[in-house]
């Protein structure tokens, strides 16, 4: 079983999948791409932590639950940091912070305006669905150490997605129009983020179309659970086509 102290050589001892189907985890090309992909997931977990703590200022009755979610995100961050160290890769955190800047700015604007539904749509739906799609696509082509970490993380991300769904479902009638507007403003950002990372993801053998498909499936399932009808969801998903 992988441990956080497992050395670089551990990635060569895969018992999962065929070596012919997996990328060369030791190549310079792989490590270069991984430095950005790994940074994105590390920064994404940090952003999620900060966002859940911030949402707690808008939902004081939910502070303890949001702190619990935030604490989980920090565990994820530590795990993904260990994944980079296991491969001997330094994460490109400057790239990752810039990568998340548009969504971060929109979240902070909504937070300042007290728009709880928008904050939840950005963090608990869009970002969580983005993460889930990325992790699902990554797991089959990951090194054994990262596979174990990522499989544990993705289970937690569904808990976070479900939290956002439950609150928005309970408050849908009062925030429907705000959510429609937030979707129009933020879903195109997710599509651009997926496009931006496609080249590096391909080096890791993560297919761009699989990423987009998995994301849209997870996001549309959340919108259905919240209570949007098929027509509304179709129109909301169309925002992803805006470049």
Swiss-Prot record:
Keywords, ordered alphabetically: Iron, Lyase, Metal-binding, NADP
Catalytic reaction(s) noted: a long-chain fatty aldehyde + 2 NADPH + O2 + H(+) = a long-chain alkane + formate + 2 NADP(+) + H2O
Free-text remark on how the cofactor is bound: Binds 2 metal cations per subunit. The catalytic dinuclear metal-binding site could be either a di-iron or a manganese-iron cofactor.
SUPFAM superfamilies: Ferritin-like
Positions bound to Fe cation 1: 45, 73, 76
Listed EC numbers: 4.1.99.5
Annotated positions binding Fe cation 2: 73, 128, 160
A Pfam match: Ald_deCOase
Superkingdom per UniProt: Bacteria
Protein family: Belongs to the aldehyde decarbonylase family.
Protein name listed in UniProt: Aldehyde decarbonylase
Gene source species: Prochlorococcus marinus (strain MIT 9313)
